[in-house]
Amino acid sequence: MPQQWPATDIARLILDGFDDYREHFRRITDGARERFEQARWQDTQTASAARINLYEEKVGETVARLREYFEPDTLMDVTCWPLVKSAYISIIDLRFDDELSETWYNSIFCSLFSHDLISDGCMFIHTTRPSLRRARAAQTRTYKPQGQISGMLASIFADYRFSEAYADLPGDLLRLEAQLRENLPDWVCKDPELSVELFSSVLYRNKGAYLVGRIYTNDDQWPLVIPLLHREGRGIQIDALITDEAEVSIIFSFTRSYFMVDVPVPAEFIGFLKRILPGKHIAELYTSIGFYKHGKSEFYRALINHLANTDDQFIMAPGVRGMVMSVFTLPGFNTVFKIIKDRFSPSKNVDRATVIEKYRLVKSVDRVGRMADTQEFADFRFPLSKFEPACLAELLEVAPSTVSLEGETVLIRHCWTERRMTPLNLYLDNANEAQVREALEDYGLAIKQLAAANIFPGDMLLKNFGVTRHGRVVFYDYDEICFLTEANFRHIPAPRTPEDEMASEPWYSIGPLDVFPEEFPPFLFADAAQRKLFDQLHGELYNADYWKGLQEAIRAGKVIDVFPYRRKGLDNE
């Protein structure tokens, strides 16, 4: 090993790239307040996509600089990279975003070297960061009502102000106080030790701003989220006060776009969120505020820890086998793993590259709470003993170019992970009458909200939707999605002759992007009762004019409101 091998220089250049990424990330994030105040909703969508793409762009730039500054024989000597890791640890020790900088280092290493060279000696498979920082207090503001809830609420909104005035602050405060008293037991509202703690920075996403914190006494606590809207021409409206943990969990769901929020010390804020949402894994919380790569790191660490400490084995996921993807899971780990088959069913008019493109598209669009977020992985290596034999046999049969056996190790060259849900078709098979109605209502609403966000699912079969633990219907099969404005919605032409009407084949031409909503009922529902109920609930989905109207609104630049919470006593404009 050369004595003067430039480990510190390489480490510093990697960290310089991270600093550049963080500066651009902060710049986009800090602009969220102004975009909200000025109601620049299309700019908000553009900024969200730009921030997601930023990470890979900056990784590419950093790798290019490394290749420019160091000779290949030096840079690519993997035996020396433990020295780079050691030097890197020493220069990130005083940072407030050190856990993110470890993930950045891993991304650079994986961009330079093949994944079979990954080891904890060369990169951060396990974090070296102290857990102490997560226990430190986040930057918050605390308010005590001291018997005057109305006065406390007034103090909160005296601190959280915008360049645009509140439209009706007195009326909003009266409504919030009523909601607070409705949501919490009377004894809590009268408790002299009652306190409200809010994170100092406002969270922004889509057309909303959110105050996030908790309400607590000496004995108990409740999460607290207060969403704000900007009603153009009228000002800022305080939209709701939410204290239900399940509802707050949905706001931070894996089906939502990422928040924009100023977090000087990310781990402190994540610790604060974890305190009010103990059921959320930190991987999901990091992802929810835009640090999706670090969320991926924390997910992987949780996965390898689960495999090391349980007897769980991979099995094929329940449900109808996919025509494009093969899906497997761990019973004790709330995730599915999706790989692309080598051969697709004949009815599928897509190829592997198109499928990859579709899944990556989902990362950058507004998922409006109706599409599961994904993480993409390359070169997963798992012990052979962790696979149920029938599962491994099926994977090797349907995707031999992706899954292979190397001694006692199973190599999965490429896969996506998604949150595991109950397939909607299986859910309906076991649901009572009320549950069927609720699920079909939400299924139609999911299709409508996706469409209004300019996403057409393509294949809308029940098996391609899942039901979350909160009972929400979510789309998760992306190989046929497209932008709604790309589809050509048509009415079925009237038959020209009696022979046309009796023909087994269409009497009209069909283009590759043509969609005939009148064909949906028998296509979506084999069960006649479910078909009839869905027609009552969402019959407009069978009319091409409904879809064309949405297309016109989207082309006119309208950005829809999709609320991740229930709204009380407000208009639904």
From Swiss-Prot:
Extract one GO cellular component term from the record.
cytoplasm
Supply the EC number(s).
2.7.11.5, 3.1.3.-
Q: Which GO terms describe its biological process?
A: glucose metabolic process; glyoxylate cycle; tricarboxylic acid cycle
Keyword Cytoplasm assigned to the entry: answer is: yes
* Primary location class: cytoplasm
The catalytic residues are D373
Q: Which reaction does it catalyse?
A: L-seryl-[isocitrate dehydrogenase] + ATP = O-phospho-L-seryl-[isocitrate dehydrogenase] + ADP + H(+)
Where does the chain bind ATP?
A317, P318, G319, V320, R321, G322, M323, K338
Keyword annotations from UniProtKB, A to Z: ATP-binding, Cytoplasm, Glyoxylate bypass, Hydrolase, Kinase, Nucleotide-binding, Protein phosphatase, Serine/threonine-protein kinase, Transferase, Tricarboxylic acid cycle
The family database entries (InterPro entries) matched by this protein are listed as:
AceK_kinase (IPR046855), AceK_regulatory (IPR046854), Isocitrate_DH_AceK (IPR010452)
Q: Does the keyword ATP-binding apply?
A: yes
Q: Which GO terms describe its molecular function?
A: [isocitrate dehydrogenase (NADP+)] kinase activity; AMP binding; ATP binding; phosphoprotein phosphatase activity; protein serine/threonine kinase activity
Xref: Pfam families = AceK_kinase, AceK_regulatory
Residues of the signal peptide: none
Q: Per its database record, what is this protein's job?
A: Bifunctional enzyme which can phosphorylate or dephosphorylate isocitrate dehydrogenase (IDH) on a specific serine residue. This is a regulatory mechanism which enables bacteria to bypass the Krebs cycle via the glyoxylate shunt in response to the source of carbon. When bacteria are grown on glucose, IDH is fully active and unphosphorylated, but when grown on acetate or ethanol, the activity of IDH declines drastically concomitant with its phosphorylation.
- Kindly give the NCBIfam families that the UniProt entry links to this protein: PRK02946.1
Q: What name has this protein been given in UniProt?
A: Isocitrate dehydrogenase kinase/phosphatase
Species whose genome carries this gene: Pseudomonas fluorescens (strain Pf0-1)
Q: Which gene encodes it?
A: aceK
